[in-house]
């Protein structure tokens, strides 16, 4: 079955971030749970992984809402990665109800920054946006008509 998912790189705190998301969305990690860099078999053409990086998250999956899967990894500097957060990507959530929208908005913005409070918009949605405490940007669009 085809699917689209969002893949997030973190600077050594993927497990913390995904445990937070797991508590927000009340779901469990998918696949084989948390895969660690220590799970990578040694390869001839690759230098050995530093001990400090072995427990980092190589891959993790979490179903969030509407069948969407959030995936992530730590991006170790020893492997040439550098994480730079920008303002060009949002994860857009479209909950079924205003109550669910408010619940998710409050949880994800806690410890982060509200960029637009939830409010009724001219296009007919109950809309708001925030950046969570891990630097991930979220938009909320609820089209429930009753308040």
Task: Give, region by region, the residue ranges found by the protein language model.
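Glycine/serine-rich loop-strand microenvironments at binding/catalytic pocket rims
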Residues: 1-4, 140-142
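Hydrophobic faces of well-ordered beta-strands that scaffold small-molecule active sites
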Residues: 4-6, 91
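Core segments of cupin and vicinal oxygen chelate
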Residues: 8-67
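Vicinal oxygen chelate
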Residues: 14, 24, 64-68, 74-86, ...
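Residues that flank catalytic or metal-binding motifs in active/ligand-binding sites
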Residues: 56-58, 87-89, 134
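Active-site-proximal beta-strand/loop segments in catalytic clefts of secreted hydrolases
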Residues: 73-75, 141-142
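Short beta->alpha transition motifs characteristic of CBS
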Residues: 122, 139-147
């Amino acid at each position: 079955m085809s699917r689209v998912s969002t893949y997030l790189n973190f600077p050594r705190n993927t497990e913390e971030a995904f445990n937070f998301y797991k508590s927000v969305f009340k779901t469990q990690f998918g696949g084989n749970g948390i895969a660690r860099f220590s799970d990578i078999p040694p390869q001839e053409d690759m230098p050995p992984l530093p001990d400090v990086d072995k427990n980092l998250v190589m891959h993790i999956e979490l179903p969030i809402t509407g069948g969407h899967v959030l995936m992530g990894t730590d991006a170790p500097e020893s492997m040439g990665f550098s994480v730079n957060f920008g303002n060009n990507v949002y994860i857009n959530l479209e909950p079924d109800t205003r109550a669910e929208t408010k619940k998710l908005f409050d949880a994800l913005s806690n410890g982060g920054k509200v960029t637009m409070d939830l409010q009724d918009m001219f296009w007919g949605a109950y809309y708001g946006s925030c950046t969570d405490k891990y630097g991930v940007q979220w938009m909320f669009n609820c089209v429930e008509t009753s308040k």
